[in-house]
């Protein structure tokens, strides 16, 4: 395909994306014609076929305006990461050890794809670290941590997400929220270290 056709195909694709984002539904073939300056509907159909062949859109020929943008992450290789209950980023709750679900995480989202699990964050104690209520915390299994790491710690069979500091005679689990006080312990069990956050907008 020559450059002018590729440019026009990109125009068609970008217009479809914009229309769906702004109006919530795809444009008609005639609307695409007008928007990108094509003289005939057959030219639009040509570009739509190319976009579909390249896996960028899906169409239902039996319906009008039935154009769907394909999620680019669906074409990427993914790993199924177990979602293990809900963790509290505030007041600790009982740790839930059963796997509630699995999450298809794009493989390029994390460096290490082994020994990962995810926990749903509940609460606001880590908001100043950019960890919000409802986020999925991506955790690498480990029983050790360096000062400053954000960890999942088990305290009396309860799990919490905090920043880890080993002081001279105690362990400090520090929330990232100025209105909350640190948890001071003689010892605690580290279940894993935060390696990423997944958030849906």
Swiss-Prot record:
GO terms for cellular component: protein-DNA complex. Coiled coil: none annotated. The active site is at residues 125, 162. The gene is lexA. PANTHER family: LEXA REPRESSOR, LEXA REPRESSOR-RELATED. Gene3D superfamilies: Umud Fragment, subunit A (2.10.109.10), Winged helix-like DNA-binding domain superfamily/Winged helix DNA-binding domain (1.10.10.10). One of its GO terms (molecular function) is serine-type endopeptidase activity. This is LexA repressor. Keywords: Autocatalytic cleavage, DNA damage, DNA repair, DNA replication, DNA-binding, Hydrolase, Repressor, SOS response, Transcription, Transcription regulation.
